[in-house]
From Swiss-Prot:
Primary location recorded for the protein, binned into one broad class: membrane
Name the UniProt record assigns to this protein: Flavonoid-6-hydroxylase
Gene name linked to the record: F6H
Subcellular location: Membrane
Keywords of the record: Heme, Iron, Membrane, Metal-binding, Monooxygenase, Oxidoreductase, Transmembrane, Transmembrane helix
């Protein structure tokens, strides 16, 4: 072969190799994630998402063991990807965050959320950004959280005093009495968020019926908000309401609208009469919406009711869920409970009540909160997202309009990150994971999500969790009502509330004068 022929052959080989590499790269960039098996004809994996095969986050976690940290499922006519590794989630919530910050259109958003006016259901856009900014600045900013200190402190003190009164009334010669804590935690959470948002609280007596009504509506709201109905999977079956779920959604939405509408009317009457200055978030909203140019089709009343309603429902349920799981875990691990009480006795003592200025010194208590949020994130699957652009994530191509499900429960039990991931061991946050935070910067631990759609009330929620847990552990000796471990069964839904009651034996451990 002469020189020119050799050069031509080499150039041809290089060209062919280049074309092959370009084709290979193009093919790899359009490679879809592996598809999970077990799909039903027509329905796809709807049986898993709807909870018919068990808790959805657990079932999806089992599929991740087979298919890896990113895999595809079908929900009727919709394609979805499920992710559960910190590397993939970081890529989604940083590089691709804007593209994955929208929500799919589901019946809960239409019927329960004022036709997607509620922040949690509205898609990423101008309206969402305006409402998010208002909520972040006027309710959950560091300045506002500090200004609301008295609400947290007074409601926590009332909660402790009510527990002491229950002990006094029921003790009947015994040093310990049994109380059911799920309901009490729900009342506490509701009163705190109601006071902040609408300036209201329920204290029993004449308020008892309205309190029960409010809690029932909020519970029903969260239960229904987590349901996938048939027409979510098959939009062309929107006329078919199998199981009556849409009818229940509409009825609950009417009750929610009536409740929040009554509070809004009270605030308007107060505003017109000139009574007092703006004190709660609803007052602030009434002031802010005057002359504001919200780029949306909603009227002012709808915006106020939708925003306040979602804050009350979300703040009540998610905070109570974490209180319940934290106490249940402590009762099943009494050595951890005793260690936390020893820390309180050392740094605070028993001659005064713990206060917020003490919390930074209670590092073991903070570790307990982190470990609770790791094992039982209040929304184990977060909220379903919808991609508004094609994305390349984890080596896979994910097309526009795909639904995204982030399995926080599985993420937080990754054995590559957490030793003995299913064990409750707060000490892990005093050792190797000491610097790991829960505020969306460490993608191995994101119980409040991350990126643009991180929970705006994260700082407030953590402050409340620490104060209530510290106050409860300082004020009472706590134990199980029997030798059997606390039942840790979860309920399926938007939040994973404990499926069974939480009965606890309590006895005071402070001087009686501190319970007044």
């Amino acid at each position: 072969m002469d020189f020119n022929a050799a050069v031509c052959a080499a150039l041809a080989f290089i060209s062919l190799l280049s074309y092959y590499l370009i084709w290979l790269r193009s093919a790899s960039t359009h490679q879809a994630p592996p598809e999970a098996g077990g799909a039903w004809p027509f329905l796809g994996h709807l049986n898993i998402i709807s909870g018919h095969t068990g808790l959805p986050h657990v079932s999806l976690g089992n599929l991740a063991d087979k298919h890896g940290p990113i895999f595809g499922i079908r929900i009727g006519v919709h394609r979805a990807v499920v992710v559960s590794s910190s590397e993939v989630i970081k890529e989604l919530f940083t590089t691709n965050d804007a593209a994955v910050s929208s929500r799919p259109s589901v019946k809960a958003g239409k019927h329960l959320a004022y036709d997607y006016a509620m922040l949690g259901f509205s898609s990423y856009g101008t309206y969402w950004r305006q409402m998010r900014k208002l909520v972040s600045l006027e309710l959950f900013s560091a300045r506002r959280v500090e200004l609301q200190r008295n609400v947290r402190v007074s409601e926590t003190a009332h909660f402790i005093n009510e527990l002491y009164s229950a002990w006094e009334e029921r003790r009947d010669g015994s040093s310990r009495v049994s109380v059911e804590m799920k309901e009490l935690f729900g009342e506490l959470s509701m009163n705190v968020i109601l006071k902040m948002v609408a300036g209201k609280r329920f204290s029993g007596g004449d308020d008892a019926e309205e309190a029960r009504r409010c809690r029932r509506v909020m519970r029903e709201f969260f239960h229904l908000a987590g349901l996938f109905v048939l027409s979510d999977a098959f939009p062309y079956l929107g006329w078919l309401d199998l199981g009556g779920h849409e009818r229940r959604m509409k009825r609950t939405a009417e009750e929610m609208d009536e409740l929040v509408g009554e509070w809004l009317a009270e605030h308007r009457r107060k505003e017109y009469s000139g009574e007092g200055k703006a004190q709660d978030f609803m007052d602030v909203m009434l002031s802010e919406v005057k002359g504001a140019n919200f780029e949306c089709e909603y009227d002012v009343d709808t915006i106020i009711k939708a925003t306040c309603g979602t804050l009350i429902a979300g703040g009540t349920d998610t905070t109570a869920v974490v209180f319940i799981w934290a106490l249940a875990l402590l009762l099943n691990n009494p050595h951890v409970l005793q260690k936390a009480q020893h820390e309180l006795d050392t740094h605070v003592g028993k001659q005064r009540r713990v206060n917020e200025s003490d919390l930074n010194n209670l590092v073991y208590l903070q570790a307990i909160t982190k470990e609770t949020l790791r094992l039982y994130p209040p929304g184990p699957l977060g909220g379903t997202r919808r991609l508004t652009q094609d994305c390349h994530v984890g080596g896979y191509h994910i097309p526009k309009e795909t639904w995204l499900i982030v399995n926080l429960w599985k993420l937080h039990r990754d054995p590559r990150v957490w030793s003995d991931p299913s064990e409750f061991r707060p000490e892990r946050f005093l050792n190797g994971e000491k610097s790991m935070d829960v505020k969306g910067q460490d993608f191995e631990l994101i119980p409040f999500s991350a990126g643009r759609r991180i929970c705006p009330g994260t700082n407030f929620g953590l402050q409340m969790l620490h104060l209530v847990l510290a106050s409860l552990l300082q004020a009472f000796d706590l134990s199980r009502v029997s030798n059997e471990e606390i039942d840790m069964s979860e309920s399926a839904g938007l939040t994973n509330i404990k499926a069974t009651p939480l009965d606890v034996l309590i006895a005071p451990r402070l001087p009686p004068s501190l319970y007044i």
